[in-house]
Curated annotation (Swiss-Prot):
Function: Catalyzes the reversible conversion of 2-phosphoglycerate (2-PG) into phosphoenolpyruvate (PEP). It is essential for the degradation of carbohydrates via glycolysis.
Record keywords: Cytoplasm, Glycolysis, Lyase, Magnesium, Metal-binding, Secreted
EC number: 4.2.1.11
Gene behind the chain: eno
Domain of life: Bacteria
Lineage: Bacteria, Pseudomonadati, Pseudomonadota, Alphaproteobacteria, Rickettsiales
Listed GO biological process terms: glycolytic process
Family per record: Belongs to the enolase family.
Manner of cofactor binding, per the entry note: Binds a second Mg(2+) ion via substrate during catalysis.
Pathway(s) of this molecule: Carbohydrate degradation; glycolysis; pyruvate from D-glyceraldehyde 3-phosphate: step 4/5
A Pfam match: Enolase_C
Cofactors (names): Mg(2+)
List of catalytic residues: E207, K337
Annotated protein name in UniProt: Enolase
Amino acid sequence: MANVKINNISARQILDSRGYPTIEVQITLSNNVFAKASIPSGASVGKFEAVELRDHDTNYYHGYGVTKAVNLINSEIGQKIIKLETLDQEKIDNALIEIDGTNNKSRVGANSILAISLAVAKAAASTLNIPLYQYLGGITAKILPTPLINIINGGMHADNNLDFQEFMIIPHGANSFEDAIRMSSEVFHTLKKILKQKQYNTNVGDEGGFAPNIKDNTEVFDIIIDAIEKSGYKVYKDFSLGLDVAASTFYKNEKYKFSDYQFSTHELVEYYKNIVTQYPIISLEDPIAEEDTLGWKMITKELGDKIQIVGDDLFVTNCKLIKNGIDNNMANAVLIKPNQIGTLTETLNAIRLAQKNNYNVILSHRSGETNDTTISHIAVAVNCGQIKTGSLSRSERLAKYNELLYIEKLLNTSAIYQGML
């Protein structure tokens, strides 16, 4: 398989699940193998994420077009990447970083770079005639992740009055990934019936979860627990709950304002301590704003030995920020979104750093998704044991779950379901 090189790179503009433009790249190799990758985009974006390249022409897709990025891939970037050795992922990714030349990928865009990076990895796996998870993880890749399923959407992911962004069910009591999806589907459909009975709407948000206008967060917990129990399952034993608070979205002037209340950092941490005691919540994502360093230290000290405290906006898949969090005892888990950093190599480095320091790792989608299933393969490749990829509706979310079901079948008796976080 030596000397299989990139022969052609072709990019085009497609639409993501929210109807905004994004990039799809096809890589063709010298052996005529080809592969495609497409890139998601977030609604709730961390301040320190690598930069997407957009057209900013308000007369074209309201400024969200990506024709500049597509043209760069089809010209300057492509010319410098063609003829590179396909199986040397790190060399290709470093070349892409060098072509950009900035510390936040703002010249050619993290979206341009990542589309190429992922397509190269897929083409390399196809060349070796092995699945992507095996190409990236080798024979040790066998853990199917526990899904954190966003069953009710709020915040920036839905047009409703819920302040918290995601209310998740976590099927840690399942015996297999297939079992986890079945159990979660049953709860999802039971929840729909309960919402209808309570005369709440059952429209879905960006990530496929229901988006009812429920004013009180605690009522959401009660309704989800009711759905779990009416589906024949038990909280703590079969399911627990997770929250993506996205606290940066309601943090201003060193105060947190939601549900008609205003909280200091200390008061907010006390609020979390209270709901974690009252409800089966085992994971809190972005419970504190990314710039509230003292708040992160406080909540990790108070709850870090009891539940999973996940940094998303805090870390943005960036090794430097993850190391800072580790050194300062902030959070105990890292959310990984490849488009926050821009290359597969940097993504894998961030995962390794977190795992080496005993931080949990969760692979994650974005609110504006495509049918690309790369994150499913990365999750299994690194044995991270957790994945966030939306609810059990909307095909761009289900594509990832269905790919994991396929991977579980490929692994056969070698497959291990993570279960408890």
